[in-house]
Amino acid sequence: MKLVYNIKDKPKFGQLIVFAFQQLLAIMAATLVVPVITNGNVLAAIESGAVTWEFTAQMSPAAALLGAGLGTLVYILFTKAKSPVFLGSSFAFLGSMAAAFAGAVSAQAGYAGLIIGAAFAGLVYVVIAAIVKFAGVNWIDKLMPKQVIGPTVAIIGLSLAGNAVGDLQKAPAGGHTLIAVLCGLVALLVTMLCSVFGKKTAKLIPFIIGILSGYAVSAVFTVIGNAAGIDALKVIDFSPITALWADGVTINTFFQFPEFTFVNALKGIKEIDGAYIGSLAMAYVPVAFVVFAEHIADHKNISSIIEKDLLKEPGLHRTLLGDGVGSMVGAVFGGCPNTTYGESVACVAITGNASVATIITAAVLAILIAFVSPFVAFVNSIPSCVMGGICMALYGFIAVSGLKMVQKVNLEDNRNLFVVSVILIAGIGGLALNFGKIQITSIATALILGILVNIILSKKKKA
């Protein structure tokens, strides 16, 4: 596709900050919600009696954001600044993180388990990277041709459709779903108009304009609802913002110091034993292989967008090392292993901005913003419906990117037709495989099925 900014291009400083801010908004909501979900899982385990210790020091979303920024910088370093994608908290490891806390003798030991588990996952990436370094990547192309990768990329976006629509329809307690949908659709419409009809600057920052427009409309409804006492019109929950000065205006109103994972982990490292380490390996290593499959799909997707094969230059071994080590760094600070974000890839595609300088700046901003209380509070106050509208475009574009790859496949050949069909139905249908606490996600299951079907049907018929 035609890019406005290529990988090595460096926009002017003012533009760079705005573009980076847009990348940050695209990945921030998902990155912040992973530690929140994990906190909820741990508290649920405590309520059920499965966990008996207190969970006073919960995981910090701000620390996860900082970890994502640091992880992205590590990734950029390993990939020689040739791959324009941001790393964020991985949803694939949610079960693994819950298992790390569930098997620990204390919350502090659980935090140590998060780091050890991420190290196991990162080690899987390092081992695969070493194999790729010596064996090359041609086997990847043979194992995962376009008829396999194309529909897999498509289902990465399509499998998130329910999340986007669910968020679009989400209203606060007492709020009306139709009002929420209206606000989300305003954000989506403005984003599309800016991207298609906007002048150069508007074309490059459609998501910022769309989110702010949706937020403004939501704020108008909320103000009217508060003034008239009509709960149905209340869309925005301003409590994250008002909480900043609930105890008076202090330094914490403006700046905060996130509670890093390694700080709590150091207190619990003495409580770690061999059995617990073994359980961590069982919880994290299989998931790492699943995420490896998604890693390839993401990089095939971004390669098609920038029209450069990232698996060959800088090389799959470098992208794996960057992802693996970046994931470990993210876990040390935020507790969450990182992964390449499809939202970031979609943002690059829609805006035509593949500048790695933008990604680096976004990573630096993520690190700095993690300490700025008002900004984190503002992001937390953005209504789910607004982000749902934006995600309809982001996730949709991921799906379309995969379908564009399928366009190049000869679907008149029944072999290709069956491969694509199996992947799409298994992925969209949500075919996940569970082995105890280990889950192979629907995307990974669909990819594995596609590979197997392609191999079986590729066998030459005997004369």
Question: In which residue ranges do the predicted regions lie?
Answer:
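Flexible hinge motifs at transmembrane-helix junctions and intramembrane kinks/re-entrant loops
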Residues: F55-T56, G175-H176, L189-F262, V285-A297, ...
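Early transmembrane hairpin of solute transport permeases
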Residues: L16-G184, F371-P374, S381, C385, ...
